[in-house]
A protein has these predicted regions:
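Surface-exposed beta-strand edges and their flanking turn/coil or helix-capping segments
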Residues: 22, 52-53, 97, 155, ...
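Iron-sulfur-associated redox domains of electron-transfer enzymes in respiratory
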Residues: 1-123, 128
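Short gly/pro-enriched beta-turn/loop segments at secondary-structure junctions
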Residues: 2-5, 128-130, 143-144, 149-150
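Small-side-chain structural scaffolding
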Residues: 23, 29, 43-46, 133, ...
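Local cysteine-cluster metal-coordination motifs and their immediate loop/turn environment
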Residues: 12-17, 47, 60, 65-69, ...
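Flanking helices and flexible, charged tails adjoining ferredoxin-like Fe-S electron-transfer domains
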Residues: 1-5, 167-239
Length: 239
């Protein structure tokens, strides 16, 4: 059941997991029904940057990706968990029913066109958007395997708790730490398949990732970056 009149939709602008036409149609129908609607380009980015809008958004209904992912993201940002509907997995009639609207609601064509234009205007940053892990603490056993595996300083240990400390350090499109998690507690909301993306399927039927190769590749990249920084320092002219 919908908790409030204000509804926030996430467009996931730099990825294609959420159909933009569905976003435009849903926004138009909600607006026609008298709801206050806001489309956010990338909720993950707002959360990574800990936007001061998060508390406001959390007080209302959020229509975005998988609820388990949204819950973990808002908990990481130390914000209340909003009522969430899954736009990534559900079709338009299912979402409308969950929002207490007729499943066959008329779609206002002019407003759909306006929202479509808004969506097309969002900045797209393929390869540079907010890719980072979040942790489902209801599953995490604080074993620290993710911390030990990651070469980029994404995780830290605070007491006996694993914390995502530097999300911006994460290597784009690398979910290797999630593959190594014994309880499937690590979520990458922008990953393609469940359970790594927070979807509820029991087992993932994806092409397996060779974590040893990923680790070695990441290590080489890190060593190369370190050598480059040392070279720059050596060649810097003296004052």
């Amino acid at each position: 059941m919908m908790q409030s009149q204000k509804i926030t939709l996430c467009a996931c602008a730099s990825r294609t997991f959420i159909n933009s036409e569905k976003v435009a149609q849903l926004a138009a129908i909600l607006e026609a029904a008298g709801k206050a609607v806001e489309i956010v380009p990338d909720l993950c980015e707002w959360i990574e940057n800990k936007s001061d809008r998060l508390k406001e958004i959390a007080a209302h209904t959020v229509v975005a990706c998988h609820p388990r992912a949204i819950k973990a993201l808002f908990e990481w940002a130390e914000q209340p968990v909003p009522h969430t509907l899954d736009m990534r997995a559900n079709d338009l009639p299912t979402l409308l029913t969950a929002l207490d609207l007729p499943a066959d609601s008329a779609i206002p064509a002019e407003r759909v066109a306006a929202f479509r234009t808004q969506l097309e205007g969002f900045s797209k940053q393929p390869g540079q958007d907010a890719w980072f892990p979040t942790i489902d603490k209801s599953r995490c056993i604080e074993c620290g395997k993710c911390h030990d595996f990651c070469l980029f300083g994404v995780y830290t240990l605070e007491g006996k708790k694993v914390v995502v400390k530097a999300p911006q350090n994460c290597k784009n499109n690398c979910p290797a730490c999630a593959r190594n998690c014994p309880t499937q507690a690590i979520i990458f909301p922008k990953y393609a398949q469940a359970p790594i993306n927070g979807g509820e399927q029991a087992e993932e039927k994806a092409i397996s990732i060779d974590t040893a190769t990923l680790y070695n590749t990441a290590l080489r990249e890190r060593l190369a970056a370190r050598r480059a920084s040392v070279s720059i320092l050596k060649n810097r002219p003296k004052a």
